[in-house]
Design a protein with these regions (language model features):
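Alpha-helical membrane-anchoring segments
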Residues: 1-309
Length: 309
């Protein structure tokens, strides 16, 4: 997140927001979040429970002009849940595999937002983060590399893309952490260091059933509470500085893995870890992806028999 090499403020601004980068980082983000969207969708099953008009989250709009009334009147009510679920599933699959290019990413964003309108569940904050990521990706060409399309994979070299969508995603991640830290700081439980201890004692969010969390754990819980608070408030500043970026991202991975191991937070931990891809150096990531892709292609390329004289 630096302007490296700029000689004037104007050049620094243009380099920071608009310099051209390899498209590989967008492709990796597309695949990672395509998989996460699929997992998030499959978590809202069985379909009859989560998607049916009369499931645990009934479709709203039952008035004379409501959407629910329109679906019932159209005659599609028995199949509506399957139609919406299947359409969303296909959009996510196409995005993950790179089929349809940006059209698949746009369709995934529409389907993801539509899922919230159709079904007020899931309750995980991961859904909101996924929406923010998909919004950032629609502004970049994510389908140039790492696709199942032979035509796309034959494009050499891949066209470079503006870094602007990546910057938007980076700032959204920073805003997520900072706003979460401010919200936590307004809670007395976070200020007195007891939030993690009480979360571990809560039978709804605790992953392992503990009737009583041992008092010996209280010191660790207090340290973890304050550490989480400091990390979230400081994340935007630490990740912006190159010298502390790697350590900050590693600390974030540890934080989210710890939360996933001890608490029922849904896919949120994995979604946030995946956003760290946006902070990796695009050029180095492109080199690594190309090396892995070429090595894989060489492994499956049929060998050419040697020609005799």
């Amino acid at each position: 997140m630096s302007t490296g090499g700029a000689t004037t403020p104007s050049e620094g601004w243009n380099r920071f927001w608009f310099r051209q980068i390899p498209p590989h980082v967008y492709a990796v983000l597309r695949i990672a979040f395509g998989v996460l969207c699929l997992l998030d969708l499959l978590g809202a099953t069985p379909i009859s429970m989560f998607w049916d008009l009369n499931g645990i989250a009934p479709l709203p709009g039952g008035g004379p002009l409501g959407f629910r009334s329109w679906v019932v009147a159209s005659g599609f009510a028995p199949a509506a849940a399957w139609m919406v679920f299947t359409g969303t599933l296909l959009a996510y699959l196409c995005m993950t595999l790179g089929i349809g290019g940006n059209a698949a990413v746009i369709a995934s964003l529409v389907a993801h937002v539509w899922q919230t309108a159709w079904n007020v569940l899931p309750l995980s904050a991961a859904h909101q983060v996924l929406t923010a990521v998909l919004f950032s990706l629609v502004w970049a060409d994510c389908g140039q590399v790492l696709t199942v399309s032979p035509l796309q994979n034959a494009v050499t070299p891949a066209l470079r893309q503006s870094i602007a969508p990546l910057r938007v995603l980076q700032y959204q991640v920073c805003l997520i952490y900072f706003s979460s830290g401010v919200s936590k700081f307004s809670s007395e439980l976070w200020r007195d260091g007891s939030a993690i201890y009480y979360a571990m004692s809560h039978n709804i969010v605790q992953r392992f059933p503990l009737d009583v969390v041992p008092l010996s754990f209280q010191g660790v819980a207090t340290l973890t509470t304050y550490g989480t608070l400091v990390f979230e408030l400081a994340f935007p500043f630490l990740v912006a500085w190159r010298r502390t970026r790697v350590l900050t991202l590693l600390a974030g991975v540890g934080l989210h893995l710890g939360a996933w191991v001890t608490l029922e937070v849904g896919p949120f931990s994995w979604v946030m870890i995946a956003t760290y891809i946006a902070f990796l150096p695009p050029e180095r990531l492109a080199t690594l992806v190309d090396e892995v892709w070429q090595r894989k292609a060489a492994r499956y390329r049929p060998s050419t028999p040697s020609q005799g004289l």
